[in-house]
């Protein structure tokens, strides 16, 4: 890994004729190495990837969330769903971020494990009777999209809708795009909702 850092450093030195730029790059590189290898592991955090940082940085005007809906032909057993959620979050490394929240300090973006994480805070059963698909879309547009997450908790919530037309049920999930992409989110929801057969 240090080999790649040295190549990158050499490249910057070749293109930089300004001494101040070279000093800036060397000092930034040193701070990055210090943070990544010595300080951040001590505080149980991990540096985010560039894509995580791109999709996780948000302002009041700019948020990047995925809202997904998956319907089922039968009623879903809630205790079984909670067990599967716990298993999947623990089993698959890519979903480990669901227990972390995103931070940025000194220009470094990183994930911090939430000290107060409980699955029950991210799971809500909705007992509202949905007369048709339009009522479901309205729930997603008005209720789910309007949720604001505090900065110190993982930015996701899963809703279980029990009373859809035809005795169907559904998952509706809102999650930060920095945690998952659309395909991995659908895979996650399908493994949580798969039947025993």
List the predicted regions and their residue ranges.
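Non-catalytic N-terminal regions of enzymes
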Residues: 1-197
